[in-house]
Amino acid sequence: MKYRILMATLLAVCLGIFSLSAPAFAAKQTLTYDDIVGTGLANKCPTLDDTARGAYPIDSSQTYRIARLCLQPTTFLVKEEPKNKRQEAEFVPTKLVTRETTSLDQIQGELKVNSDGSLTFVEEDGIDFQPVTVQMAGGERIPLLFTVKNLVASTQPNVTSITTSTDFKGEFNVPSYRTANFLDPKGRGLASGYDSAIALPQAKEEELARANVKRFSLTKGQISLNVAKVDGRTGEIAGTFESEQLSDDDMGAHEPHEVKIQGVFYASIEPA
């Protein structure tokens, strides 16, 4: 009897140690579809303990990759023009009206060690865009494509290890919210549909021309990833991010809004 009690105690201790040392993303892997469906858990990024204040060493002679990068937005701000001309435009909070499908996940890419000791992350693949709609206080709804496509982000020089003082900053591409085959309510499109929904538009009518002539625009966005937690043993990092990009312009029909997105992120650094 004593032997069985001893074995049970040892087994419990071993399982406890294993669970503590397991990567953060492993906890999500144990959940079934029934555990996740309808709960919003699929939209949440893995997290690290507050005690994760270590460092992940970087060897300039080796190559690395960033895997499982997850970006979970928590706040969407839209720049609003003031009613008083003496005031400056400022970002105002909005209400998210999209369902629980706003996070970017499984993003991966090469992590280069540059000659000046800085690190550069080049995004290659993953779920790197999500169509999102937010609503302003006045009721106006702003669609946007939350994305980090083709992200190239670098750190400060002379980085020998990734710590809580490491920041990645860079630019990414923001594709059009609509694709070429999209038709607006009047049947106008880029690759198909009517060329014009107005009989004889007046010459030099720019507003009518913008609505008739559809364009697939590609703009730039900026992002800053601030590392706040590091697990030096597993290579996991977590922190906060802030990105700025443009909203949808209805394929050139109107001017886009400036959008600021804030949230949390998680990623794993691995030798290539």
UniProtKB/Swiss-Prot annotation:
PSII binds multiple chlorophylls, carotenoids and specific lipids. The keyword Thylakoid applies. One of its GO terms (molecular function) is oxygen evolving activity. It is found in: Cellular thylakoid membrane. It is a peripheral membrane protein. Residues 1-26 form the signal peptide. GO terms for biological process: photosystem II assembly; photosystem II stabilization. It comes from the Bacteria. Pfam families: MSP. Its main location: membrane. One of its GO terms (cellular component) is photosystem II oxygen evolving complex. Keywords: Membrane, Photosynthesis, Photosystem II, Signal, Thylakoid. PSII is composed of 1 copy each of membrane proteins PsbA, PsbB, PsbC, PsbD, PsbE, PsbF, PsbH, PsbI, PsbJ, PsbK, PsbL, PsbM, PsbT, PsbX, PsbY, PsbZ, Psb30/Ycf12, peripheral proteins PsbO, CyanoQ (PsbQ), PsbU, PsbV and a large number of cofactors. It forms dimeric complexes. One of the extrinsic, lumenal subunits of photosystem II (PSII), which stabilize and protect the oxygen-evolving complex. PSII is a light-driven water plastoquinone oxidoreductase, using light energy to abstract electrons from H(2)O, generating a proton gradient subsequently used for ATP formation. Required for dimerization of PSII and for binding of PsbQ to PSII. Belongs to the PsbO family. This is Photosystem II extrinsic protein O. The lineage of its organism: Bacteria, Bacillati, Cyanobacteriota, Cyanophyceae, Acaryochloridales. The gene is psbO.
